[in-house]
């Protein structure tokens, strides 16, 4: 097979389109796409050909949608390749080692990874970049704006709460009932309004250590210099508020991941300063290893990574100086899947750690409603310690539930973007992820409430 029949805009207008030649053909199996078909064309099993007439309902009109001929066979009848249904790499919610499917199918035809449109429209109208090519080219350092990325960033220690934040928590923790957790644990500036998932950007912005790579955030959620909350503790590298502003010039490149000038980031208007592509790469490069490494001993460190990953991904959705959310929409869907898996891994780690803490309780004081933890097993929070089992359960569960709400917000916004792009199949898959995250929220509430139950079974 050497070409594709294109059905023209006029009835009975059929043209023969040659396949791509040379390097592009070897990479994409002879099919070059720089186009995202509309849902109607997808349902009709239409694919784009090489003429720039364009379907007026498609996202990109650089290519014309037409019937695509399948691989050669004994039959002379043309065959249209069936649509590959959405299928994320791992919907089980557990840590896995499965790799993304190859962009080339057995028939040598370009295939969307997981059913997501992976084609990027090149601004020059030349050759498209598929997901596999993008990751490969970035890993080879072809993009200068990624040279200073710190790969495999790890966070050590426990949550770094400030003294005031801990006082607010601990002053409301004695004899606290699980049902009152959200109402009473986070007080002061971190009030109920901040707990709302829609306040995601304004709450996490002061601690969002990835914002320097992302740039502008939606104007609908302006920054608040007064917002201080326990969730700011997730920036492990900061030991004081002053260290979150400007870093010295000799360490600015390596510490850009940790410290950010947020005012400068929000004032950017030049698309060349956008680092969304780099942020997407960093998340994809690190998140799987964090899923695999989640354990009771590093539960807070992994939770910290999840918060920053969710914040960075959310900012990509709201960035106004680039359209990476459209070009790499499929990757955002994969990130949503991985965020769901990582959330499940964190809850599993919480359950195991809760059991460990329960076993370490000083049973000589078991009659006390505020059972004391073994001093050697107590949790260090900055210069303070969570010294009772109830303190550990309430604080940990509150923070995890709060993070789950932000993860739900990200997946929900990605689903809304899919609907706006007319990617209905992808929106349905994201809706399943959103439901899974909501189930995890319910499980967290139930685990905290069922004090005497077997917490190993989630």
Swiss-Prot record:
TM segment ranges: none
Chief location: nucleus
Domain of life, per lineage: Eukaryota
Stretch list, region Disordered: 69-109
Keywords from the named record: DNA-binding, Metal-binding, Nucleus, Transcription, Transcription regulation, Zinc
Signal sequence residues: none
Subcellular location: Nucleus
Example GO molecular function: DNA-binding transcription factor activity, RNA polymerase II-specific
Biased composition (Polar residues): 71-100
Positions in coiled-coil regions: none
UniProt entry tagged with the keyword Zinc: yes
GO cellular component: nucleus
UniProt cross-references to CDD domains, sorted A to Z: GAL4 (cd00067)
InterPro entries: Zn2-C6_fun-type_DNA-bd_sf (IPR036864), Zn2Cys6_DnaBD (IPR001138)
DNA-binding region, residue intervals: 38-65
Presence of the UniProt keyword Amino-acid biosynthesis in the record: no
Functional summary from the UniProt entry: Transcription factor that specifically regulates the expression of the gene cluster that mediates the biosynthesis of PR-toxin, a bicyclic sesquiterpene belonging to the eremophilane class and acting as a mycotoxin.
Record's protein name: Transcription factor ORF10
Organism: Penicillium roqueforti (strain FM164)
Taxonomic lineage of the native organism: Eukaryota, Fungi, Dikarya, Ascomycota, Pezizomycotina
Gene coding for it: ORF10
């Amino acid at each position: 097979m050497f070409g594709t029949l294109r059905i023209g805009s006029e009835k009975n207008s059929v043209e023969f389109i040659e396949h791509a030649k040379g390097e592009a053909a070897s990479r994409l199996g002879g099919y070059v796409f720089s186009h995202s078909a509309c849902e109607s064309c997808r349902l009709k099993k239409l694919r784009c050909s090489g003429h720039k007439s364009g379907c007026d309902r498609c996202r990109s009109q650089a290519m014309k949608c037409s019937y695509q001929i399948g691989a050669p066979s004994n039959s002379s009848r043309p065959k249209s390749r069936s649509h590959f249904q959405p299928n994320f790499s791992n919907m089980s919610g557990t840590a896995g080692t499965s790799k993304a499917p190859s962009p080339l199918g057995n028939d040598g035809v370009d295939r969307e990874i997981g059913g997501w449109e992976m084609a990027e429209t090149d601004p020059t109208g030349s050759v498209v970049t598929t997901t596999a090519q993008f990751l490969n080219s970035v890993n080879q350092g072809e993009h200068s704006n990624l040279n200073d990325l710190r790969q495999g960033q790890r966070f050590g220690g426990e949550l770094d709460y400030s003294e005031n934040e801990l006082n607010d928590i601990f002053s409301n923790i004695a004899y606290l009932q699980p049902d009152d957790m959200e109402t009473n644990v986070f007080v002061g500036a971190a009030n109920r309004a901040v707990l709302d998932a829609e306040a995601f950007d304004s709450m996490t912005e002061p601690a969002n250590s990835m914002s320097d790579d992302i740039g502008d955030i939606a104007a609908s959620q302006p920054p608040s210099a007064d917002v201080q909350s326990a969730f700011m503790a997730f920036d492990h590298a900061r030991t004081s508020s002053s260290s979150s502003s400007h870093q010295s010039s000799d360490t600015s490149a390596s510490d850009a991941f940790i410290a950010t000038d947020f005012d400068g980031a929000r004032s950017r208007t030049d698309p060349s300063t956008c680092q969304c592509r780099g942020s997407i790469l960093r998340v994809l490069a690190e998140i799987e290893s964090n899923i695999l490494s989640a354990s009771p001993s590093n539960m807070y460190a992994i939770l910290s990574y999840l918060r920053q990953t969710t914040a960075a991904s959310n900012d990509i959705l709201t960035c106004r100086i680039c359209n990476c959310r459209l070009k790499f929409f499929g990757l955002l869907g994969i990130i949503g899947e991985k965020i769901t898996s990582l959330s499940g891994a964190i809850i599993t780690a919480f359950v195991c750690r809760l059991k460990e803490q329960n076993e370490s309780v000083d049973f000589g004081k078991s009659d006390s409603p505020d059972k004391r933890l073994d001093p050697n097993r107590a949790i260090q929070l900055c210069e303070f310690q969570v010294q009772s089992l109830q303190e550990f359960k309430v604080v940990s569960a509150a923070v995890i539930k709060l993070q789950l709400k932000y993860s739900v917000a990200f997946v929900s916004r990605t689903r809304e973007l899919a609907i706006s792009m007319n990617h209905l199949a992808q929106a349905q898959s994201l809706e399943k992820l959103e439901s899974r995250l909501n189930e995890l929220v319910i499980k967290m509430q139930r685990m905290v409430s069922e004090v005497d139950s077997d917490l190993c079974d989630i």
